[in-house]
A protein has these predicted regions:
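Hydrophobic h-region of N-terminal signal peptides that target proteins for export
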Residues: 10-18
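Ordered, small/hydrophobic-rich secondary-structure cores
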Residues: 1-11
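Structured catalytic-domain cores with a bias toward divalent-metal coordination
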Residues: 3-5, 17-385
Length: 385
């Protein structure tokens, strides 16, 4: 951590609008805030802040970077606010570059924006540091927490742990306060070891979410009720349209998928009239596979997975999709597709243990209980969600 002297800090703060609840600290030349108030952010420019979101053992503060592209002065009243969040899972890195690219682009456009874009390129600082999915809490023997299951978080005074407080501060000091987010897009990849193309979770019961999901023009669009405690579902529960976007693989920057997602964000900004555009944005759905059900197939053995079907290939019920082999190369198990559909996620890491996924199939179930979305597992189709 590189804190400036009080004189240098004062100089930095003097060059910004004097508000936004600054803590008085400056980290790597960037002012630290504990609360974002858009009215206090300079209009027609991009501002950078660090938001203080908690503490580690030893009292070391935790910060996350925040970028704000605030448009014309009147756009706080006339325009909408879009939030882009990335890397709540620390190994999911394609989204980081999407947020960076959008704000690089907005440098030349912010003066005319009718609205505001808030960017969080790295939501989970502990996950980023450890280059893995979860937030590490050091107390006792240590534990790992999926931060995308604890929103809107828990306050320190109510016994919140590190990840709970991180979520609490992001929600209450950034999104649900005077920033008044109108649309939230949470960017992900699959967990390490898995591969997909471009897809999304979308709760079509919520206003504007169907439109938002189609603007993505994904390879697979999963109609889904969402996960309690996730960013997407928390936004939706509070009446804010939101989408979870999944991009390719963890721990890589896939330029093609980054480009497609940047294009998506631009379509959303035009659709919300934050950015200028000619006419209504018409998404191209000609290659979009819309499904209400994901069905996971898992192995009962430890060994090595041999994929037989690539991502986005069509499959038929009973078609072999993977072999599981032992160390000698013998086939221990052949997994088959549970239904006619499409391979939407497949393991890139061949190493597996009992219970590991060897492929997830997307399809449309005729079960009325799956009309708003289902996630099933195993040969019997046990319902996980």
């Amino acid at each position: 951590m590189q804190l400036l002297t009080s004189v240098a800090a004062a100089a930095v703060l003097a060059s910004t609008v004097s508000a936004a609840n600054f803590t008085g600290d400056v980290l790597n030349g960037v002012p630290v805030i504990h609360d974002l108030i858009l009215a206090d952010v300079p209009a027609q420019k991009i501002s950078r802040y660090y938001l203080r979101v908690g503490e580690l053992n030893g009292g070391h503060p935790v910060h996350i970077p925040v970028m704000v592209a605030r448009g014309t002065p009147e756009s706080l009243e006339t325009g909408k606010t879009l939030s882009l969040s990335a890397a709540i899972h620390g190994d999911e890195l394609n989204p980081v570059r999407v947020v960076q690219r959008i704000f690089e682009q907005l440098e030349g456009e912010v003066a005319t924006l009718n609205g505001t874009v808030i960017g969080l390129p790295t939501v989970n600082p502990m996950g980023i540091y450890l280059n893995q999915r979860n937030y590490f809490t050091a107390s006792a023997s240590g534990s790992l927490t999926n931060v995308n299951r604890v929103f809107p978080g828990t306050a320190p005074a109510l016994g919140g742990s590190g990840p709970d407080i991180l979520a609490f501060n992001i929600w209450n000091q950034l999104w649900a306060n005077a920033s008044a987010v109108d649309v939230g897009i949470d960017l992900h990849t699959p967990s390490s070891g898995g591969e997909t193309s471009l897809w999304c979770y979308a709760d079509w019961r919520a206003p504007y979410v169907e439109r938002l999901s189609k603007l993505l023009q994904p390879d697979t669009l999963k109609v889904d009720v969402g996960e309690p405690g996730s960013i997407e579902t928390t936004f939706v529960d509070y009446g804010v349209p939101s989408l979870t976007v999944e991009m390719g693989q963890a721990k890589v920057w896939n330029t093609s998928l980054i480009d497609r997602t940047v294009d998506f964000v631009n379509r959303v900004m035009r659709d919300l009239h934050i950015a200028p555009g000619n006419g209504t944005v018409e998404p191209d759905l000609s290659r979009v596979y819309i499904a209400n059900t994901f069905h996971d197939t898992y192995t009962q053995y430890g060994g090595f997975v041999e994929r037989l079907v690539a991502v986005d290939e069509p499959v038929t019920k009973g078609q072999p999709i993977a072999h599981v082999r032992n160390a000698f190369g013998d086939i221990l198990e052949t997994l088959v597709s549970p239904a006619d559909g499409r391979m939407f996620q497949s393991p890139r890491d061949p190493s597996c243990e009992p219970g590991s996924s060897v492929g997830q199939i997307a399809y449309n179930s005729t079960d009325p209980e799956c009309a708003d979305g289902c996630i099933l597992s195993g040969p019997a189709g046990s319902r996980r969600r």
